[in-house]
Amino acid sequence: MSSDIQQIRIGLTNNHPCSYLADRMERVAVAIDPQMQTPETYEVLMANGFRRSGDTIYKPHCDHCQSCQALRIPAPDFVPSKSQKRLLKLLSQEFHWQLKPELDEDWYALYARYIFARHRHGSMYPPNKMEFAKFARAKWLNTQYLHLYQGEKLVAIAVTDLLPNSASAFYTFYDPDISISLGTLAVLCQLNYCQQTKKQWLYLGYQIDECPAMNYKVRFNPHQRLVNQRWRG
């Protein structure tokens, strides 16, 4: 970290029930200096375990839990597994993707179906256009929407932050009625983008081993986890 970033002011939230582990309490550290809100600085902060929600930059700071570990993939070194190779073959045959600065007009119907089917008991329920916009956008970042199509049909959107030397998989939603792993396919598209544009890293957010819904992340290899402020893997 640079000396400027070492001196950032941090605010701590109160403890509240964890969104992922039912028996835990969570608390986050929030970077409260507006000058931290630049793509270059945020990229350094991500390398030190921070993420964003809207314009807010934060990092888990729980009293008795270290389960959240930032995870990233070195894009040039990625080697797909057998199942990922099958998805890549499908991608070349049936699907195509496109990065766009704005959402397609029919995005909300897809998003609402996804939330109703997969996250009815989560913090995003009930789906709301304005709340999603506040959550997904940051005024100071180049955020793009990776649209995944099956033929002409929109089947997934991956909100993707573009940084100078990396990309960040921020949030993905998809058609809940399609049986193939659209979430994994979206990450493969993001890795494809990183390789095309010679970006070093794709950040996948936090990995929590006790949370089965997150286990898809560790299937991308090689990957690194931030453990005790050191990237390992």
UniProtKB/Swiss-Prot annotation:
EC number(s) from the headed UniProt entry: 2.3.2.29
Short name of any one Pfam family annotated for the protein: ATE_C
Molecular function per GO: arginyl-tRNA--protein transferase activity; leucyl-tRNA--protein transferase activity
A Gene Ontology term for the protein's cellular component: cytoplasm
Family annotation (NCBIfam families): PRK01305.1-3, PRK01305.2-2, PRK01305.2-3
Family affiliation: Belongs to the R-transferase family. Bpt subfamily.
Protein name according to UniProt: Aspartate/glutamate leucyltransferase
Organism from which the protein derives: Vibrio cholerae serotype O1 (strain ATCC 39541 / Classical Ogawa 395 / O395)
Gene encoding the protein: bpt
